[in-house]
C-alpha cells in the first residue's frame, strides 16, 4: 500500500482565465497539465464574470461546487450550481461559467481508461476499503485538523489537505467534511 499527503501549501498553483487553479494530484506522477495524463484532481477559484473553461479533448470531467454560486453553460445548456452540487460533462464540451461572486470548485478530469468507482461528499464519519488492486483513493479535507486513519496509522489533515492512497489492502476512516474519490485504472 502506498499513500501520501499533499498539504495545502505544497499544491501547485496556476492561473486560468477565470481565477487560480490548485493541483491536488495528477496521475501518473510526473505528468503535467500540458502533457498526457490519466487524471487530475484540483480546485479552482472562479472570479465574478463570464469565463470559458479550458477544453480537455478525450477526457471526462466532474465538477463539485464548494462555495459560491455559478451558472455553467455546457454545449448551450445552463446548469445552476450551489455548494456541493455537482455536474459530469465531457472535456470536449464548450463550457463557460458566469458568477456574481468568487466561487470555488473541486475538479476531476479523467481519461476513458479511468473508471470512477465512487465519489462521496462526506459530512461526518466515513470509512472505506480499497475496491481494487489498481484503485487510487483520494480524500480532500474541507475542515481544520481532521484525524484520518490509514491501516491504523493516524494522520492529521489541515483544511484543503489531500490524502492519496493507492493499491489494495488498506482501510481509511475518519471524521469531518470532505470529498472522497475512488478511481480504478483500466489496463
Where do the PLM segments sit?
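Jelly-roll (double-stranded beta-helix
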Residues: 1-187
